[in-house]
Amino acid sequence: MSSRPPYLPPIPTHVPGATAAELAALPEPVILISGISGGGKSVALNALEDAGYFCVDNLPPELLPEFIRLQRAQAVRKVAVAVDVRNAASLPKLLPLVDQLRREGTRILPMFLESRSDTLVRRFSETRRRHPLSSRQDDQGQTRSALIDAIEHERELLASLREVSTVIDTSDLRPAQLRTWVRQLVGAAHSSLTLVFESFAFKHGVPRDADLVFDLRVLPNPHYVRELRPLNGRDAGVIDFMHAQPEAAEMLAQIEGFLLRWLPSYAMDQRSYLTVALGCTGGQHRSVYGAEQLAQRFRERVPTLVRHREIEAREAVL
């Protein structure tokens, strides 16, 4: 049985953007990795190195243009650069330099890795590493309050860079999951715009990387059907249940129509990614179903990725 209900409206077959030939002719974008200390930049950079990228960590921002020109002159196609708060004094120069490089025709994909503060505190405690901005210490190293202060200060310093980047929240990701997610994002980087559908549970908060948020809690909940409770929105039983709900069909059709109407405008805004977050109570049934169904409808029109935050978080602790 088809996973697409017959009563849904047809989908337009074209979203404005570059042609396949034009996209293929573009050079590889330079991947610019930044983010909060402890957020996973090293894991991301290692994943890119394994994927064939020439990677440099902690490059001073003022050296970025000359470094990229040198790599291009040597015909190095895949380049990734990590910058972080260790070069705090030079960070204000970074965004103007990125704008300059783009005007010169260099494609740059900024990726910003972050985590919740409690997760960062735990990671620093486990690794016994000191935060680069932490100054106050007790006899056993940095105090918790000093560490939290340093994390919040770092967020302030990097706020403008986060604003223009594709944000990846690594709070609930294992290193292997982060490596996979980074490779998927980079693999889609030749498109003019990539759609990311992300399911989540409102009780755990709205994803920090969401651009658009839709609330699916008003839809009938499969959780209250005993045999469906242990399943999720990718399972046939839940799919059949949701297909039978007129409200679900109407809501997804309206979200689909909204995205089709505004995708060209988002693409013209020079975004690389648009993250559409769909939430329900537990992040297992309705939101997962909605993310999967919308991804199916857009996959043949624009590059599309799907992630399920709560399912991935549960798998991370198994």
Swiss-Prot record:
Protein name as catalogued: Nucleotide-binding protein Lcho_3490
Molecular function as annotated in GO: ATP binding; GTP binding
Function: Displays ATPase and GTPase activities.
Family: Belongs to the RapZ-like family.
Matching Pfam families: PapZ_C (PF22740), RapZ-like_N (PF03668)
Domain of life, per lineage: Bacteria
Binding site for GTP: D84, V85, R86, N87
SUPFAM superfamilies in alphabetical order: P-loop containing nucleoside triphosphate hydrolases (SSF52540)
Coiled-coil ranges per UniProt: none
Binding locations of ATP: G35, I36, S37, G38, G39, G40, K41, S42
Keywords from the UniProt entry: ATP-binding, GTP-binding, Nucleotide-binding
Organism, scientific name: Leptothrix cholodnii (strain ATCC 51168 / LMG 8142 / SP-6)
